[in-house]
Amino acid sequence: MSQIPRNLDYLHRRRIVYRRDPLDPPDIDTPHYMFYENGTYQAYDLFKGNAKINTYKSLKWHLLVLWYLNPKLDPDDFNGLAEFIVDKSNGFTTFSISKTSLERIIHDVYMSDLDRPPTNRLRKVVFKMGSGLDKHEKLSIVGRLIGRSKRIHSDDIYQCMIDMNDMGKKITIR
């Protein structure tokens, strides 16, 4: 993985929005986090971790989110932002991209519907910026709120077997 630090100062100086808390009202709101019982797709927090953009698809998604979060951004400024992000020496990507490929991606971003937010993963716990919690404390909170409800228990398997039997399906072990 590339060890070049990200040049976030460029985004800050140009007042580019690259993170936004969800607009949905949370079920639980504390000074440290927001909890959504059914989850939210509206939490955008680009460039938070150490991971870099390493595919064209990821680059296109990042540019789409930046375009969505900055609707008043001039197209020329957006082109400059895209060129800055794809410059490997600025620490955002792990690969170089040709000018024509970048122009094609930018064109696709321009043609996208901004009335629909970009696809995002479902998040149930969103930690507030500057919460002061370290990674271990955050994991503890998530474990306490969500728990291990996604694990399969023997009762679940037994109920599934009963349901399959009621439907007349053959039950096999593989």
Name each region found by the language model.
Residues 173-174:
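Helix-turn-helix DNA-binding elements, focusing on the entry/boundary residues of the two helices
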Residues 167-169:
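Flexible coil/turn residues that form the inter-helical turn or adjacent wing/linker of helix-turn-helix
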Residues 2-165:
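Modules that initiate DNA replication and primer synthesis
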